[in-house]
Amino acid sequence: MFIENINHQNINTKFNLLDAQKKDSENFIDYIKIALGEISKNQNHAKIDSEKFILNQSGISLNDVMINLEKSSISMQLAVQIRNKIVSAYQEIMSQQI
């Protein structure tokens, strides 16, 4: 019967936890990148639609332009609020004494 060293098991568990934390942070970063891409896409779409409406091109109504502008505005406001929460959490963590 083979008895495995307790310290060896403990170290492997810690490495597994670090790997899980790394994967979670990568998922968070990927999510932020995707969200910022969507915000950029909304803003570009709103800009293009408003330019088409100003140039009186067919197929673009004022309703569509206003809806796209509001989507763009709301998504940007949400991004700013998320950024503020992240900065606030970072500052709170950095102000804690160890």
Curated annotation (Swiss-Prot):
Places the protein is found: Bacterial flagellum basal body
Protein name: Flagellar hook-basal body complex protein FliE
PANTHER family the UniProt entry points to: FLAGELLAR HOOK-BASAL BODY COMPLEX PROTEIN FLIE, PTHR34653
Gene Ontology CC terms: bacterial-type flagellum basal body
Protein origin, superkingdom: Bacteria
Pfam families, alphabetized: FliE (PF02049)
Single Gene Ontology MF annotation: cytoskeletal motor activity
